[in-house]
Amino acid sequence: MYDYIKGKLSKITAKFIVVETAGLGYMIYVANPYSFSGYVNQEVTIYLHQVIRDDAHLLFGFHTENEKEIFLNLISVSGIGPTTALAIIAVDDNEGLVSAIDNSDIKYLTKFPKIGKKTAQQMILDLSGKFVEASGESATSRKVSSEQNSNLEEAMEALLALGYKATELKKVKAFFEGTNETVEQYIKSSLKMLMK
């Protein structure tokens, strides 16, 4: 099994990205492939989950370990496969999903692709209370998350002051959510994306 891959992002399609390392190109299915568009031909680190089937070995990739943990929780539910779990992650913020499960909000959960009432009920039964670690609810995690967000916000404000538009920065900010960098590192990495 693979935990993560580090290599050059060589290709982006509507469903997957390709990361090249040691002369091999790995096809990795991700929730929002175009969120990686600023990193083509640059080194990236993608967290992985491997699914082995009779007819294929598939890799699913994630921006952060938290996103991967949520995916793993989702596929543990009867009726939710990797593709459906990825679709859920693609159309929702993690907080909304966690809140819906913990509050038994079936109506909210059935808005997701391929999630009917029965599967939504199963999600609530199986996952209620299990997203605490993945969503960063411990005191330590909240503190770290707050510091990360503060640095990221400061970097975005600096880029706004440099003349970049909020619409341009929205995609950049989304890419770095959940990462842990200094203000200077965020600015430097963001500029690389914006200059592509």
Curated annotation (Swiss-Prot):
GO terms for molecular function: ATP binding; four-way junction DNA binding; four-way junction helicase activity. Pfam families: HHH_5, RuvA_C, RuvA_N. InterPro entries: DNA_helicase_Holl-junc_RuvA_I, Hlx-hairpin-Hlx_DNA-bd_motif, NA-bd_OB-fold, RuvA, RuvA_2-like, RuvA_C, RuvA_C_sf. Homotetramer. Forms an RuvA(8)-RuvB(12)-Holliday junction (HJ) complex. HJ DNA is sandwiched between 2 RuvA tetramers; dsDNA enters through RuvA and exits via RuvB. An RuvB hexamer assembles on each DNA strand where it exits the tetramer. Each RuvB hexamer is contacted by two RuvA subunits (via domain III) on 2 adjacent RuvB subunits; this complex drives branch migration. In the full resolvosome a probable DNA-RuvA(4)-RuvB(12)-RuvC(2) complex forms which resolves the HJ. Belongs to the RuvA family. This is Holliday junction branch migration complex subunit RuvA. Transmembrane segments: none annotated. Residues 143-148 are annotated as: Flexible linker. Residues 1-63 are annotated as: Domain I. Its main location: cytoplasm. Keywords: Cytoplasm, DNA damage, DNA recombination, DNA repair, DNA-binding. Residues 64-142 are annotated as: Domain II. Has three domains with a flexible linker between the domains II and III and assumes an 'L' shape. Domain III is highly mobile and contacts RuvB. The RuvA-RuvB-RuvC complex processes Holliday junction (HJ) DNA during genetic recombination and DNA repair, while the RuvA-RuvB complex plays an important role in the rescue of blocked DNA replication forks via replication fork reversal (RFR). RuvA specifically binds to HJ cruciform DNA, conferring on it an open structure. The RuvB hexamer acts as an ATP-dependent pump, pulling dsDNA into and through the RuvAB complex. HJ branch migration allows RuvC to scan DNA until it finds its consensus sequence, where it cleaves and resolves the cruciform DNA. Residues 148-196 are annotated as: Domain III. GO terms for cellular component: cytoplasm; Holliday junction helicase complex; Holliday junction resolvase complex. Coiled coil: none annotated. GO terms for biological process: DNA recombination; DNA repair. It is found in: Cytoplasm.
